[in-house]
């Protein structure tokens, strides 16, 4: 399915929440996922954003359209891709996760606004064990610096994802 969380849900019995603003991708999730699904983009605060919806072709490249949206040229150059820009209202981590305080795993792949969402999480309130984030610019240390401040260590890079673990739970 291309999902970091799918394995844990399907084979380990984990439950969670998936944020998917793309209408096309959300409909696919509804067919094969049991976790809570939210058909909105997640961001650091609730606001209206421009969303780049890829309807055909590179549909996995949809994302919030801002200065950090790195996929635009790739999508526009792909002759099989059809896309449109639409307005969507974002939701926040806190609005959807506030009842949980201990979280085994979070996977964040939101096409360039990962750090915005990470900055909005209260790491003193939520005890998160492992976080993976998509990082299309591995030469930048933004994530490593952020997680170091939160007492997380870098574990590994798998494809475009960097995995960090909380020192409170693991001692390697």
What do these predicted regions represent?
Residues 1-172:
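Phosphate/nucleotide-binding beta-alpha loop and adjacent structural elements of enzyme active sites
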């Amino acid at each position: 399915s291309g999902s970091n969380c799918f394995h844990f849900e399907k084979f380990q019995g984990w439950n969670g929440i998936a944020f998917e603003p793309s209408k096309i991708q959300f409909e696919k999730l509804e067919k094969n996922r049991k976790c809570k699904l939210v058909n909105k983009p997640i961001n650091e605060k609730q606001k209206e954003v421009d969303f780049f919806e890829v309807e055909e072709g590179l549909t996995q490249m949809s994302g919030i359209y801002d200065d950090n949206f790195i996929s635009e040229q790739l999508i526009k150059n792909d002759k099989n891709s059809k896309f449109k820009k639409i307005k969507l209202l974002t939701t926040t981590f806190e609005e959807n996760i506030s009842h949980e305080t201990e979280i085994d795993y979070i996977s964040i792949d939101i096409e360039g606004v990962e750090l915005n969402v990470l900055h909005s999480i209260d790491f003193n309130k939520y005890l998160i064990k492992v976080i993976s984030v998509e990082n299309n610019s591995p030469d930048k240390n933004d994530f490593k610096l952020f997680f170091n401040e939160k007492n997380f260590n870098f574990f590994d890079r798998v494809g475009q994802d960097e995995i960090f673990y909380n020192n409170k739970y693991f001692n390697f």
